[in-house]
Regions:
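Glycine-rich phosphate-binding loops of nucleotide-dependent enzymes
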Residues: 2-248
Length: 248
């Protein structure tokens, strides 16, 4: 089976700073790959490259085994890659359905917003993600942090995302909402969605990821099966740049 997404030798520089320096990774369908490293390690730059916000200076990107190049975030989204930012980028004054279709609204043949069609598409999607999510008519500013994550993930899936880049999805959530988001991520993976989980939270890493990769100073320290390492070994990778004994 081809990797859903593969990066070979990615490079990105800003002046004399090598923000991403020869980094490679692969992501299989249904896999959760944790992307780790201190601030400034190059994680965000690499994710912006995959999201089409920054061009590659070198290296290669493949989707389902075929080379891909993005000139804009719209190209990345059209290829099935969606990014869920830590701040979620939701319009607080709009309800969940309006956020789901924000910028990609359905319209009638007369050019008017087709509210009925958008609601009809939204209801089963929200039910699929969280059967207890009933507040689709309320402004998202009134929703809890976990419910807002549901809206952001639903927006990505509505447009056939096959790869999700998730930036700190459980930041500032309480235990019950963290558990809800964990369950949601596991169900998405079970459906074949590949997930790049950018996080500093070790419990999230060990609860969710199949593999983890660590970056430091723009370079790849190593990649390993999450179950094959301890938290202390992962911290050694992050802090000291010490690769695991048996990278996978």
């Amino acid at each position: 089976m081809n990797a859903l997404l593969e990066v070979r030798g990615a490079r990105k520089s800003f002046g004399g700073v090598h923000a991403v320096d020869g980094v490679s990774l692969s992501l299989a369908p249904g896999e959760v790959l944790a992307v780790l490293g201190h601030n400034g390690a190059g994680k965000s730059t690499l994710m912006q490259m995959l999201a089409g916000a920054l061009p590659f200076d070198g290296g290669e990107l493949l989707l389902n085994g075929s080379p891909a190049k993005f000139a804009s975030p719209a190209d990345s989204r059209a290829a099935g890659i969606e990014t869920i930012h830590q701040k979620l980028a939701l319009a607080d004054n709009l309800d969940s359905v309006a956020n789901l279709f924000l910028g990609r609204e359905l319209r009638t043949r007369f050019g008017l917003l087709d509210d009925a069609a958008m609601r009809a598409a939204a209801v089963p999607l929200f039910a699929r993600l969280n059967p207890n999510f009933k507040n689709i008519a309320e402004p998202v500013q009134s929703l809890s942090g976990g419910q807002r994550q549901v809206v952001a993930i639903a927006r990505a899936l509505q447009f056939k995302a096959r790869v999700l880049i998730m930036d700190e999805p459980c930041a500032a959530l309480g235990p019950s909402e963290t558990a809800m988001v964990h369950d949601l991520i596991r169900r998405l993976a079970a459906e074949g969605v590949g997930i790049l989980l950018v996080t500093h939270d070790m419990p999230d890493v060990f609860a969710l990821s199949n593999r983890l990769m660590v970056m430091k100073n723009g370079r790849l320290v190593g990649v390993t099966q999450t179950a094959a390492v301890t938290e202390n070994e992962v911290l050694a990778m992050i802090i000291a740049g010490k690769a695991p004994a048996a990278p996978l």
